[in-house]
């Protein structure tokens, strides 16, 4: 008999499961462009979709790595045999994914690239991908012993209101360098997309759409219109006289 739990406890349990799963996959797949996870629960099994920029690395040779990850997830979270399935899905637009760009900046800094140059490169790539705006903040011991923060901004960025929840994608990462730990924060404002592929379907509250006027058909010959009053009944056909 299945154990009955309250709705409140169910939501908390689902949230903890997703947070732990996300933390585990972030640690395991950081070098493969891991960008998030989706969990779909069906009556027969649980489907876990891993979003990444390099899906081939996630799958591994002949699907070996994805099978290993499936076994680890199954054992860690106590799923019955064959009831959990892992899939790898490629991120549609890498430039509009804050997690992917934060990881990209992290590896640039680990490679020894100058902070300003690395941040401007990420900023330019995000804006070229069609973002409405972006903000990159790097803080820590950038130069010298005193910690400071550098902010790089381009385009439009909203900071308050409900649209922030679905228009702004945020990611935070940390990178350990010789001089200490640097913090990386990337915020991307997504564009409005009526199809919902690269951005939210819902437009911003202050969005004004101008409706194009219909083309007016100009009359080529004189015509007369009867406005108001009752239309005249059609004339009755006259009888044809017979000889």
UniProtKB/Swiss-Prot annotation:
Pfam families for the chain: KH_2, Ribosomal_S3_C
One annotated Gene Ontology cellular component of this protein: spindle
Crosslink feature (Glycyl lysine isopeptide (Lys-Gly) (interchain with G-Cter in ubiquitin)) location: 202, 214
Catalysed reaction equations from the record: 2'-deoxyribonucleotide-(2'-deoxyribose 5'-phosphate)-2'-deoxyribonucleotide-DNA = a 3'-end 2'-deoxyribonucleotide-(2,3-dehydro-2,3-deoxyribose 5'-phosphate)-DNA + a 5'-end 5'-phospho-2'-deoxyribonucleoside-DNA + H(+)
Membrane-topology descriptor: Peripheral membrane protein
MF (Gene Ontology): class I DNA-(apurinic or apyrimidinic site) endonuclease activity; DNA binding; RNA binding; structural constituent of ribosome
Entry-annotated residues carrying Phosphothreonine: 42, 70, 220-221, 242
Subunit relationships: Component of the 40S small ribosomal subunit. Identified in a IGF2BP1-dependent mRNP granule complex containing untranslated mRNAs. Interacts with HNRPD. Interacts with PRMT1; the interaction methylates RPS3. Interacts with SUMO1; the interaction sumoylates RPS3. Interacts with UBC9. Interacts with CDK1; the interaction phosphorylates RPS3. Interacts with PRKCD; the interaction phosphorylates RPS3. Interacts with PKB/AKT; the interaction phosphorylates RPS3.
Family indicated by similarity: Belongs to the universal ribosomal protein uS3 family.
Protein name (Swiss-Prot/TrEMBL): Small ribosomal subunit protein uS3
The species this protein was found in: Pongo abelii
